[in-house]
């Protein structure tokens, strides 16, 4: 039978990404990092790590691509877990800053209200600083769920977990004799200047026996990624610093509501009811 990765929910990771319409300058990036140093310290993300990204700029004359360094920063908190009688540190929360985007990730999801409050405390001051110089290009909400098959792999049936009548999953996975992947997506216009990307990625995987908790070692699993991304076309969406908080709150709540609706279309309704997941 299929089980969720943890008793309270199946969410292995949640990610919220705010993408800028163009890369921030080095001066603004330094201001953003200072804001994040304050906000992340207040929430307990005390581990810091510099990261180096790059973008390719095309020169007009020779049409050559020139790599340009883009310094960024990771802010992380860790939690102690026990894996096969060994105590290990694993990342529990992370804020990633690159001149192109800000992202908040959690591996210890409890509830939407709690996570929205946390990510707002972490990201809002930085976004308020960023919109003084640039516009917002996109906002994305992504859930990665994992389900574990507790039994003989020969008895695995994808339709016991997934809805075999949805057009969001490739139908051939329900007759696949072994591992499979189904990645689908579509764009829908929201307004004349924005569109929404909906993504559903289903990946059947056999977990390694080494380095995994006993509940996962050697098991057949299904990872289910559902994501919604609102993209603001042309020159992006412009805000004043005072308007950002209201926009971010309403935007994230709207994406969350539609993410629940997307989940209902993908998960087998009987399984969802039995495990108190969103269902019809």
Q: Positions of the model-derived regions?
A:
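Short, charged/polar micro-motifs that form catalytic or ligand-binding hotspots
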Residues: 102-113, 245, 249
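A short acidic (Asp/Glu
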Residues: 27-28, 115, 150-154
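Secondary-structure boundary elements
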Residues: 111-135
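N-terminal low-complexity, intrinsically disordered segments
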Residues: 1-97, 278-280
